[in-house]
Curated annotation (Swiss-Prot):
Name by which UniProt lists this protein: POTE ankyrin domain family member B3
Start-end of each ANK repeat: 172-201, 205-234, 238-267, 271-300, 304-333, 337-366
Residue ranges the record marks as coiled coil: 489-577
High-level lineage: Eukaryota, Metazoa, Chordata, Craniata, Vertebrata
Annotated Polar residues bias: 476-494
Biased composition (Basic and acidic residues): 377-392, 401-412
Keywords: ANK repeat, Coiled coil, Repeat
Gene symbol of the encoding locus: POTEB3
Family annotation (Pfam families): Ank_2, CCDC144C
Domain of life: Eukaryota
UniProt-listed InterPro entries: Ankyrin_repeat_domain, Ankyrin_rpt, Ankyrin_rpt-contain_sf, CC144C-like_CC_dom
Family membership: Belongs to the POTE family.
Length: 581
């Protein structure tokens, strides 16, 4: 089941386990992470806990008591009723008062979906607690002690490495390299690396020496291990890599070095968190910016289907939400429970984030509307319409021209038929017309006879011819004006197309310039990293040289002391011999 959604409470607002410290006594440190390392045990002088309170707690918790408190295990008395259930009302009040510690402290609450923390009960932060080793002197042999404390002369270390196996493990499966890297003893680390010890050995929590060095923020040891080929993609029992711990510690230098040596920027831990999602979850804004520049996947999902944007909204981090929205992330993506980032913001009452999301949606809608109303498409439509008009006008002109000879032919045929019917001019037609009809061969004889007539023999008046010629002139003028208009429109289309081509060329040039800038930026970053590594190497060489000088001075002092002692012994012996004589 997916837990209810609410915003993560601030560290100051989280209630610590309400009176349980004083009443539980010594068990408080074992069960509650908030009490570990605080130095305030709240125990009396006897160091015992309040038995009466523990009895009431057992009776109310029932069967969950054995899971949660070591003092109840193996007692044989479960204090469970006949139903075998615990007091739900008591557990509800306990959860509400304890807040986020409830899921860490009580196994009965883990995975139940009834956490009062909302989404934050899902992730176990115990992987990032107590990064340094807890070391007891009696559990370590000579080599491991020397690696941990680092206050042993180099000669003695070399002798130890000859006599013992440098890859030997202690009870917690730690090698000398683990201990030296976790405690920042770079001289011991360098000596072990020069002797070619195993780099990727796992301790009892499946962590390598590189992971421990990153976790404990020992930068010098990290660089040494990476230079000698340590694997940065090995996952511990929580699924975290060295990059996860660098992001959690907000150590940009270590993150850069790990990525430079091939660390996977998209590796997921057991909670499904990539380094970017972990940075968002822990509200590490500077590291999130760095990972975005390194092109981390902004659409990666955790095990509950939540994106970086949804996690940022649930955390209530408006700055990270704004940073992600600048990268044009998908606002409408849903997690496994079917909720979006906006729904989480509304349910958590994050008004600033709601405004950011609504403004972003409005901008996206405006972009989509502007893309739909594309000027290129409008120009194409106008050019197509104009070409169709031109075609129609061209088709109409030959039709008019072809109709005129057909009308003339029909008239000539009618005249010939009338002549044949009435014989020799009964209607009183002019002689030249009948002679032309009889002398001509069919239609061809009539048409030239019409053309050769003089003005006095014409049947139609001059006004009709003038009107006909004026109509022809008007038609030609119209055609010329249409041709001029089409020519102007074509010129406009050509100019628009030229403008579009120029705009497209400018866009291409800008994109190319941006890509060149990005490449230059990447090259600069690589050169900067190489310079930083070179500077670190120089510092390491200087420290080595200084240490060698110190060792030489110490050896000289030891030899001088030995000589003085030998002289003193000789003098004492001579004095003894004299006294005996």
């Amino acid at each position: 089941m997916v837990a209810e959604v609410c915003s993560m409470p601030a560290a100051s607002a989280v209630k610590k386990p309400f009176d349980l410290r004083s009443k539980m006594g010594k068990w408080c440190h074992h069960r509650f992470p908030c009490c570990r390392g605080s130095g305030k045990s709240n125990m009396g002088t006897s160091g015992d806990h309040d038995d009466s309170f523990m009895k009431t707690l057992r009776s109310k918790m029932g069967k969950c008591c054995h899971h949660c408190f070591p003092c109840c295990r193996g007692s044989g008395t479960s204090n469970v009723g006949t139903s075998g259930d615990h007091d739900n009302s008591f557990m509800k009040t306990l959860r509400s008062k304890m807040g986020k510690w409830c899921c860490h402290c009580f196994p009965c609450c883990r995975g139940s979906g009834k956490s009062n923390v909302g989404t934050w009960g899902d992730y176990d932060d115990s992987a990032f607690m107590e990064p340094r080793y807890h070391v007891r002197r009696e559990d370590l042999d000579k080599l491991h002690r020397a690696a941990w404390w680092g206050k042993v002369p180099r000669k003695d270390l070399i002798v130890m490495l000859r006599d013992t196996d440098m890859n030997k493990r202690d009870k917690q499966k730690r090698t000398a390299l683990h201990l030296a890297s976790a405690n920042g003893n770079s001289e011991v680390v360098q000596l072990l690396l020069d002797r070619r010890c195993q780099l990727n050995v796992l301790d009892n929590k499946k962590r390598t020496a590189l992971i421990k060095a990153v976790q404990c923020q020992e930068d010098e040891c990290v660089l040494m291990l990476l230079e000698h080929g340590a694997d940065g993609n090995i996952q511990d029992e929580y699924g975290n890599t060295a990059l996860h711990y660098a992001i959690y510690n907000e150590d940009k230098l270590m993150a850069k070095a790990l990525l430079l040596y091939g660390a996977d920027i998209e590796s997921k831990n057991k909670c499904g968190l990539t380094p970017l999602l972990l940075g968002v979850h822990e509200q590490k804004q500077q590291v999130v910016k760095f990972l975005i520049k390194k092109k981390a996947n902004l659409n990666a999902l955790d095990r509950y289907g939540r994106t970086a944007l949804i996690l940022a909204v649930c955390c209530g981090s408006a700055s990270i939400v704004n940073l992600l929205l600048e990268q044009n992330v998908d606002v409408s993506s849903q997690d496994l429970s079917g909720q979006t980032a906006r729904e989480y913001a509304v349910s958590s009452h994050h008004h600033v984030i709601c405004e950011l999301l609504s403004d972003y949606k409005e901008k996206q809608m405006l972009k989509i509307s502007s893309e739909n109303s594309n000027p290129e498409q409008d120009l194409k439509l106008t050019s197509e319409e104009e070409s169709q008009r031109l075609k129609v006008s061209e088709n109409s002109q030959p039709e008019k021209m072809s109709q005129e000879p057909e009308i003339n032919k029909d008239c000539d045929r009618e005249v010939e038929e009338e002549i044949k019917k009435h014989g020799s001019n009964p209607v009183g037609l002019p002689e030249n017309l009948t002679n032309g009809a009889s002398a001509g061969n069919g239609d061809d004889g009539l048409i030239p006879q019409r053309k050769s007539r003089k003005p006095e023999n014409q049947q139609f008046p001059d006004t009709e011819n003038e009107e006909y010629h004026s109509d022809e002139q008007n038609d030609t003028q119209k055609q010329l004006s249409e041709e001029q208009n089409t020519g102007i429109s074509q010129d406009e289309i050509l100019t628009n197309k030229q403008k579009q081509i120029e705009v497209a060329e400018k866009e291409m040039n800008s994109k190319l310039s941006l890509s060149h800038k990005k490449e230059e930026d990447l090259l600069r970053e690589n050169s900067m990293l190489r310079e930083e590594i070179a500077m670190l190497r120089l510092e390491l060489d200087e420290t080595k040289h200084q240490n060698q000088l110190r060792e030489n001075k110490i050896l000289e002092e030891i030899e001088s002391v030995k000589e003085k002692l030998l002289k003193a012994i000789q003098l004492n012996e001579e004095a003894l011999t004299k006294t005996s004589i």
